[in-house]
Design a protein with these regions (language model features):
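N-terminal accessory regions of S-adenosyl-L-methionine
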Residues: 1-93, 201-232, 237-242, 246-254, ...
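Class I SAM-dependent methyltransferase SAM/SAH-binding core
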Residues: 88, 93-138
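Residues that mark the start of a beta-strand
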Residues: 92-93, 144, 183
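Short conserved AdoMet
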Residues: 108, 183, 218
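A short acidic, Gly/Pro-enriched loop at the edge of an enzyme's catalytic core
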Residues: 136-148
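A conserved beta-strand element that flanks and buttresses the S-adenosyl-L-methionine
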Residues: 149, 154, 158
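Conserved class I S-adenosyl-L-methionine
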Residues: 160-162, 187-214
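A short glycine-rich, Lys/Arg-flanked "PGG" loop and its adjoining helix->strand segment in the class I
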Residues: 166-187
Length: 259
């Protein structure tokens, strides 16, 4: 590092600390270019004193200059799908079990939602209440919930990832609870990883087959099935054959309990 700019030496030391000593040459070159650019434009960035601009406040974002905006296809699409279902069905109120906080915080703008989670979230928004519940033993009477969702959740139950107890059939218990509490004529929005082969990636999640999900909810009627593919594509009206072609897709099931 002899002859290097002192600020780059500072960056290099921070990089070594943050990476545990392993640093790619490309990463160092990228940080050096960033630092040189900052030194070049620092005075202009202050805009005549409108902003304070110091090297100790640097926050390098070095991998965001891409041609398209990256996103998590599972979580963008399944929550968008569910919000559209609620916008279409317009229940008087809705109960969600441990799904995405982004989903409940946005959908509660047009449907009152009570959100239950093993690890309750301290959200403070109108039309949204947050409470604690164990999905394998829900605090509701039989057939008492008219509109219910549980998305990208059941695949984790019993795998100890979130502090829950080890239970190889915890997911089965959870799905039985969803069926138990769903009211006659009520709808369940359900999403899990889906593929052609049922697998467990301990302790992250399970992957289900289309037929296994339908079997678990055999007493319910499937109204709609959407799919997020391995390639990140969304199919609004998907088939079992398309689900079987995936390794780690996201199956979005809309079930109804017949009266």
């Amino acid at each position: 590092m002899t002859g290097a700019h002192p600020d780059f030496c500072m960056f290099f030391a921070a990089t070594i600390r943050d990476t545990g000593g392993y640093v790619k040459r490309e990463e160092l070159a990228l940080k050096e270019r960033f630092l040189l650019r900052f030194l070049e434009v620092a005075e202009q960035l202050q805009d005549g004193g409108r902003f304070l601009c110091r090297k100790e406040d640097l926050h390098p974002c070095l991998n965001d200059a891409q041609g398209t905006s990256p996103f998590d296809a599972h979580y963008i699409y399944h929550t968008a799908w569910a919000a559209r279902v609620l916008a279409r069905t317009r229940p008087a109120s809705h109960i969600d079990i441990s799904s995405s906080l982004y989903f409940v915080s946005i959908a509660s703008a047009f449907v009152p939602i009570t959100f239950y989670d093993y690890r309750p979230a301290p959200l403070t928004l109108g039309n949204l209440r947050c409470k604690r519940a164990d999905l394998t033993s829900l605090p509701f009477a039989d057939e008492s919930v008219d509109s219910l969702s549980c998305m990208h959740v059941v695949e984790h139950i019993g795998l100890e990832r979130y502090g829950d107890s080890f239970s190889p059939q915890g997911d089965i218990a959870a799905m039985r609870e969803l069926v138990r509490v769903l009211g006659n004529g009520g709808r369940l929005l359900f999403a899990v990883p889906i593929g052609g082969v049922a697998k467990i990636h301990y302790n992250a999640h399970r992957i289900y087959t289309y037929s296994a999900v339908l079997e678990a909810f055999g007493s319910l009627c499937l109204e709609e099935f959407a799919l997020v593919t391995d390639r990140g594509e969304f199919i609004a009206h998907a088939s079992e054959a398309e689900a079987q072609q995936q390794k780690y897709g996201c199956g979005c099931f809309l079930f109804k309990k017949q009266k």
